[in-house]
Amino acid sequence: MAKEKITGAEAMMRSLEYQGVKTLFGYPGGSIMPTFDALYHHRNTLNHILVRHEQGAAHAAQGFARVSGEVGVCLVTSGPGATNTITGIADAMIDSTPIVVIAGQVGASFLGTDAFQEVDLVGITQPITKWSYQIRRAEDVAWAVARAFYIAKSGRPGPVVLDFAKNAQVEMVDYEPMKLDFIRSYDPEPNPDKESLQEAAELINNAQRPLVLVGQGVELGNAQDELRAFIEKADMPCGCTLLGLSAIPTSHPLNKGMLGMHGNLGPNVKTNECDVLIAVGMRFDDRVTGKLDTYAKQAKVIHLDIDHSEIDKNVKVDVPVLGNCKYTLAMLTQLIRKNEHSEWIDSFTEYEKTEYEHVISKEIHPVDGALNMGEVVRAVSEASNNEAVLVTDVGQNQMMAARYFKYSKNRSIVTSGGLGTMGFGLPAAIGATFGRPDRTVCVFMGDGGLQMNIQELGTIMEQKAPVKIILLNNNYLGNVRQWQAMFFGHRYSFTPMLNPDYMKIAEAYEIPARRVMKCEELQAAIHEMLTTDGPFLLEACVIEEGNVLPMTPPGGSVNQMLLEC
């Protein structure tokens, strides 16, 4: 392809298009104006979504990436514009979400002079990105963009930052598009060791009580089919991490539910009873393991992961299997024998019955006509035929949504797992509607988290984004209040919330809305929400002091889950 002399800003636009980008989220400002001017001429091919705060741009890019499997992109200015994306970048790093953040920067000759809106973005973001690079010359644009996208989406995905100096945006360059599929000294997908695969297969073939822990890595590796073939051949039950919940349908008979502090009783307790523990694309987060000194000490541990740094980081591994789990699972499935573990699988039933009797039935079948959080979640899930994309904020709403929503399709849960970012939900849901416009997107929020990025209702209004917002309003910072009730003597220190009238707020943003306060109002309201074209806000006034159970107490083991407060 012949080279053409264009500006660095124009080269950026063409490079994004060459990478397949069609949607980006951003907010203009001084140091990025030449690039936004170039974007003006590409507005028919690059759909720019104007957010109301740069944090919203980063979270929207995350939501887009999580549901689509593509790289999310955001475009912001220097200084506060760039620093406003930091929380989203950190969130993407810990949750392995591929995004590219392009931020304006002062001209190269002004660097280090404390110029207006100058910050050392590369220095700030190096610990929370896979790669952070400052583009000082227009001739580096095509290479930097190609490298950024390759790094963001290869291996264990994650965020990349491009700090785009203003002089590089206006300089002329002989442009030639570029793609990369190799970087020397960067090995994103290690090849699995055949000896390790054989050792893992031998352990699985001889196991009497195997348990598979399913993480987000299964979805990131597009290994859902391989996972099902693996567990079905050896008849092995599994539990899913928060981010791995939609890697296998909720209805699958070998899926025993969610792992973690507020997960299901069976898979948590059985972690300390299994004889072989097979972790697939998960990182043994502290919310999953509980007290490490007592975690799965009786079991041989097999860990399948693409990232060697996760091996032995939290839990001692007997057999590590490095590589993309799409391939390692397929290889391992060929090596294991067809088996059956009916007695072991049946032993989960007593825990399922106990949890249903003490927790679930009370949550989804209230006796006094008041609304419970889990009841609302289950009703929305069923009304959407369990096919909607679930987005959550952080807090009780997150755990209730994760527990009571059901999943039938992959890439169906978008939530802030590792960082636990309140305010994530609303902008992430906006991104999800652009990433998968063919699917219904439902976001569950608390009254605390909604107000953290409530300005993005303006983005929803402008774009007519069909986000279905379910506000679980309990007039508390509910998760903190629950801890205060259980462990701090019911001293509710600054957790009660005085809330605005959300119906009036929705009206101001031209978003149809409805408030429900009783069980008998719920079904009609959900039907109205799901059949309304465009966005909708459903405010469910739930009981104020509801608690998320079961719960592993702080410092406790996974087999010490509390069923009541």
Regions found by a protein language model. Give the residues of each.
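N-terminal alpha/beta PP-like core and its mobile active-site loop of ThDP/TPP-dependent enzymes
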Residues: 2-343, 383-386, 466-469, 494, ...
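Phosphate/pyrophosphate-binding active-site segments
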Residues: 2-3, 139, 202, 298-394, ...
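Active-site diphosphate/adenylate-binding microenvironment
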Residues: 9-22, 30, 35-40, 352-432, ...
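Active-site nucleophile and cofactor-binding loops and adjacent substrate-binding regions
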Residues: 27-29, 48-59, 74-81, 136-137, ...
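Short acidic/His/Gly/Ser-rich catalytic and metal-binding motifs that mark active-site loops
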Residues: 35, 171-174, 247-250, 355-357, ...
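Thiamine diphosphate
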Residues: 102, 116-117, 268, 312-314, ...
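Generic enzyme active-site microenvironment
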Residues: 161, 303, 391, 444-445
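Conserved short loop/turn motifs at secondary-structure junctions
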Residues: 215-219, 365, 446
